[in-house]
């Protein structure tokens, strides 16, 4: 029986506790912030209060929405999302969203949802019993900091930055001015607007404007410290006006900070919800009194002790809510405010005024209005432009000096072999390239966008085109297996250079005409802010296609240069062989392309792209001309000019062809065809006395001088000596390796004695050699060998 009674009592107790637990309300906080909770200011303090309340009351969770000032729609979405997630205590922390808070409070008035809304008064009509209004008395805080500014200013000018009358009335601006006026009677006050609670860039720039006008202390109604950062960046002391203890971050640079602690407010009203004791139609007024959510931090040691004492005395007075020097001042009659019986401006008129006080006889106020950041043009840095211009100018000077040297020493053997006129064309093309680099470093305009591509492209075309054509001639002369007489003058080569240049100009014209090449201003590129812009070159899709074709065209020229470099690598006369410089130049250009192309594709700033292109153009061009001409000038300096000397070779890597014709009526010796300085021709051989053509044992051909010594068939070796009878004739005997020219030649038929020959000698005849019985000159084909004597070529112009 006793057990039954005990169980009944236990069951009743359980039901009672269960009913009590169910009767307890839950509280889920949702805070709407105008800015970011990491601003170390007002939004940070609000979010910090949410966290403290959640911890103090053991709440399961709470919500926070940030950066809602950007859009009213975002604030509405945040409220709807909060209600959807079960929040029943919604805090509207910014006066920007006051009306939205009242709107949704009315929309959900029948629901068990409570509201804490920052505003300047209760809603009209006041039909929202579950709404508590925070009256944030910032005026006394700004008055105090204005007092500090008036004491500390050295310029006599202070300023204030606020969102503006369309967002926030000018009560804070007037309060700050009255505080500064209380400590300095002749103070000058500057006022400016940003149009927003949170716009760091505009606030910073507006502060710089006030500083440039003499302000050394600036108050503000902003959610971050951008204004004070501008002061500190200029070497001045700042004020802590965000509700956070800013000295914890910036130390002694902060003269004084006010602090807001909203945790007591959050805990108080959340407790009312949990205990079901919500006070209807209430207002919360912030004060400097104990528990009033407002207090001042400690002074910086840089603030004089006398100033600290004076300000501290004023703070003690302000703890009495009846002491309101920021509102009770006869100067408000300047802006037609009404006064109460205590001599203070009407509270609502004071809080809502959009007019700035006019100052006194010795103190003036200047309203600079809404500040907007001017759109700033950002050009390439002067150091970049100056550096690229100087380097390019030095390279142009190097090319000009090289051109002068080529002209002065055009008769030197090493310069003749390189064709002076084409050397000048190559250097001229390089000058155009370096000029294009200078243009490339300038700020883009419609003209510059086209000119820089034209100059670089035409410069490379003249440079590579001249190099290709002049070495193509070397290849043709040395690669002559049929021993044809070839006369390739400069005038025959000019059309090829002109043709390559014409193709380049045609592609460029298509690019210019179809591509809509222009300079346009863009914002938001690279590291630019939304208030900065830069000029960039642009084109349409057709222009891009034409540009790709142009790149392919230049790529083909590089491949052609590779091919010709390979074909002339066997030329054994050093003065003619430019295979190594050409190959090295191509390697360098290709290497730079492997650097440039990935960099151009990868994200990088426009300035970085310009630097990459220009530096690669300068490096490749400068190294190329250094390889081509540096070695020539060095040989001239170390080995002499070698004027009117012959070219010589004693290697076996090249073969030369010689056309021999019998001339019966002329004297013995070697005769060359007449030619101008730019013409290359093969020599012609006249009558030979007491000579025979030797047996070609090594399957090589060469150009040699025939002597009058007899040769026997037993020796099978002859010494050949060709005597030059015409010093004015100009030739270029250039041929490539020909191993198969004389493989079937074992013996050469004996030459019929000329009337001037003194004796005949018989040579062994090869069974496989055709006889020439018509007393004609026999074509001699010989290749140089290490075992043969040295050959000589007359060095006129090649």
Swiss-Prot record:
Phenotype of gene-disrupted mutants: Cells have tip formation delayed by 3 to 4 hours and complete development with normally shaped fruiting bodies only after 26-27 hour. Cells are able to form normally shaped mature fruiting bodies, however with a lower number of produced spores.
Membrane topology recorded in Swiss-Prot or TrEMBL: Multi-pass membrane protein
Biased composition (Basic and acidic residues): 752-774
Entry's Gene Ontology cellular component terms: cell cortex; endoplasmic reticulum membrane; nuclear envelope; perinuclear region of cytoplasm; plasma membrane
Transmembrane segments: 389-409, 420-440, 448-468, 495-515, 546-566, 581-601, 610-630
Alphabetized UniProt keyword annotations: Coiled coil, Cytoplasm, G-protein coupled receptor, Glycoprotein, Membrane, Receptor, Signal, Transducer, Transmembrane, Transmembrane helix
Spans annotated as Disordered: 752-798
Name of the featured protein: Metabotropic glutamate receptor-like protein A
Species per Swiss-Prot/TrEMBL record: Dictyostelium discoideum (Social amoeba)
